[in-house]
Design a protein with these regions (language model features):
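Catalytic nucleophile-elbow at a beta strand-turn-alpha helix junction centered on a G-D-S/GDSL motif
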Residues: 1-9
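C-terminal accessory helical subdomains adjacent to catalytic cores in phosphodiester-
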Residues: 9-29, 39-51, 58-184
Length: 184
């Protein structure tokens, strides 16, 4: 797992515990980093014989054409490599969390805007360590089949043009689920 920040790190760390998925979620792979730095980590994972799952927010690409081009280049570069899964979310991973509760592809301008709507469904949600380090919020996201609903919703949105809010985190969940089932 390669990710951008604390929210992603804690989510995937707790998801592994809650769902019994098997993957490495090393804190050093989760920090604010550029797409170029992510590519270096992807290459390191591939050289080590692993599968690189890269989780990133795409909101920076709306206003920064250089970053937009870098994300596009990264996605294009690894498009045919089954060992690399790019799980970008527009505007942020909070949109992925929202899909656990709502079937929406509404355009959100920022992660803060998504978080405000998310708090209607998950009132305690905060982007700070004292909230994120507790497993309960991820357990709540996964309860009552909400994780699979989020996957279905995100998959349906992915069939549309990427002009609206979207999340490709479902690709990682599909991989984790497939690997878990193959071990049975």
């Amino acid at each position: 797992m390669i990710g951008e920040g604390l929210t992603e790190r804690w989510y995937f760390d707790h998801l592994r515990t809650v769902m019994g998925y098997r993957y490495d979620c090393k804190p050093r792979f989760f920090s604010h980093q550029s797409y170029e730095e992510m590519r270096k980590l992807i290459e390191w994972v591939l050289q080590s014989g692993g599968i690189a799952v890269c989780v990133c927010d795409a909101d920076i690409t709306r206003d920064n054409m250089v970053e937009s081009q870098r994300l596009k280049e990264m996605k294009d570069h690894y498009a045919e490599d089954e060992r690399v899964i790019i799980c970008d979310s527009m505007p942020s991973i909070e949109f992925w969390f929202l899909l656990h509760y709502l079937d929406t592809s509404k355009h959100f301008n920022s992660s803060a805007e998504v978080a405000n709507v998310l708090r209607r469904c998950l009132p305690a949600f905060q982007k700070n360590g004292s909230f994120l380090d507790k497993v309960q919020w991820v357990a709540e996201l996964c309860a009552d089949n909400k994780l699979m609903l989020a996957c279905e919703r995100a998959r349906a949105i992915s069939q549309k043009a990427e002009t609206e809010s979207y999340s490709n985190v479902f690709k990682a969940i599909d991989l984790f689920k497939e690997n878990k089932e193959s071990l049975k």
